[in-house]
Amino acid sequence: GAGVSGLYLLRGMAGRGEDGVLTSIDIEPEFHRAARTAFSEAGFQAGRSRLILGRAVDVLPRLTAGGYDLVFVDAAKAEYAHYFEQGVQLLRPGGVIAFNDVLSKGKPVDPVRRDTEAMALREVARAVAGDERLMPTLLPVGGGLLAAARLEV
């Protein structure tokens, strides 16, 4: 549901004594309302989250470069490659960019598949693996998580 990933991230920050702010971008107003309600019901102050209504491709370039510890991408898979470079630009050294649901039935996408989603997932995997600024890993949890830490450069 709306806000589930955000709740986990907020709980993780609170569990470590972090006072960070969760920034979430979504184009759907009802998802924002649901997330805000979920965060409030879980006991998080309104100032712990910043919900931005808009298309991520329009919003990401306006965010502070080098100002984020984590960029979590959970969007239409066909758009993942569009978010890659913008997401990396937002990371502090040591920060992590993570792409959700990158596996197909627990395995990398079949190279024979030529549909838009499969091609987009392969494209972002190649981009992450080939980027010298990053140290990538593929975690077979849930639908698969492609994560990469930004190196100190």
Annotate the PLM regions:
Residues 1-153:
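S-adenosylmethionine/decaboxylated-SAM
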